Amino acid sequence: MSIDDKVRSIVKEFKAYVPGKSKEEIARNYGIDPERIIKLGSNENPWGCSPKIEEKLLNEVSNLHQYPQPINPELMDEISKFTKMPVENIIVGGDGADEVIDNIMRILIDEGDEVIIPIPTFTQYAISAKIHGANIKWAKFDEENGFKLDVESVLNNITEKTKAIFLCTPNNPTGNVIPTEDIKKIVESTDALVMIDHAYIEYSKEEYDLTSWALKYDNVLVLRTFSKVFGLAGQRVGYGVTSKKVVDYMMRIKPIFSLTRASQVSAITALQDKEFFEKCLKEGIESREEIYNGLKKFKQLEVYPTEANYMLVKVKNGMNSSEFCEALLKKGVIVRDCYSFEGLEPYYFRVSIGTSEENERFLKIMSEIVE
């Protein structure tokens, strides 16, 4: 008998997650100087994290032999001030918001329960739901309607077995927000937990921020992260804002020390450095417009409007997305091939914001490939 006979059948169905490519990988595979590589594939903050974090981390080195605080009061207070939400309604997790997603599935899902996921969207929702025994009911962001959420495709899938509904807004990878009235209709039509993923909400108009709904509705959990505008993707800190009851259940199964000392210090400092946050947000939106307007000039591309720090692009020059992305890689540009996203044809890629210099070089290289 081999280990294959012991592994759960659902795990055998999975394919490994395909992350955005790293500079190190491209330098190694294509022989390109890492300093010349433009990384626009992982929705990161190209200006990095707050410069004040380095000193704080150095001061923390002498404490690394000690376990971190399971719940850091200072971090909770800073998140509370940032979101204007009570500490009692906040749950913080390591591994970005992924830990919050996984823990929600752990407390909600029994074998055979149902989870509704509109696609294309962030792939981790389905992975986490399936591994905990859920049956996925697919709804859709309608490609023929600019990837607007098909609300009826969500509502028509709600049954007595529905335990959770995932709504990513702005949606990854399409970049569009879900209208507030559509989300309200879904939330008020079910007692299932509606997960509103706001990983990119800082880049959107303030009116689209529904974090306060965690106090208005018992069946809402809003996901937030430090990986995007705060520039802490490498520290893996995320959090959820939800009802006190949900927080209580999650605290019962939450990993005790999932947040390291370094990640806690980094997140606290990032929230306190409001000047750097505002700078990154302002320059990020400017960068988004720069890339969007530049790509719109190419007739062989269809560029979708966005409220995030990335945009979805459809290739219409006869190449599929993998061929197109490979051509960019050979010139030292990393974007995200979207072939692995359920619900997308193999002609889409996603491009993240960059610095002005990176954007200029990227658009020049694009002109060489497209025209």
Swiss-Prot record:
Reaction catalysis annotation: L-histidinol phosphate + 2-oxoglutarate = 3-(imidazol-4-yl)-2-oxopropyl phosphate + L-glutamate
Keyword Cell cycle belongs to the record: no
EC number(s) reported in the record: 2.6.1.9
Record-linked InterPro entries: Aminotransferase_I/II_large (IPR004839), HisP_aminotrans (IPR005861), PyrdxlP-dep_Trfase (IPR015424), PyrdxlP-dep_Trfase_major (IPR015421), PyrdxlP-dep_Trfase_small (IPR015422)
Modified residues (N6-(pyridoxal phosphate)lysine): K228
SUPFAM superfamilies hit by this protein: PLP-dependent transferases
UniProt keyword annotation of Transferase present: yes
HAMAP family: HisC_aminotrans_2 (MF_01023)
Descriptive protein name: Histidinol-phosphate aminotransferase
UniProt record, GO biological process: L-histidine biosynthetic process
Gene Ontology MF annotations: histidinol-phosphate transaminase activity; pyridoxal phosphate binding
Upper taxonomic lineage: Archaea, Methanobacteriati, Methanobacteriota, Methanomada group, Methanococci
Recorded family membership: Belongs to the class-II pyridoxal-phosphate-dependent aminotransferase family. Histidinol-phosphate aminotransferase subfamily.
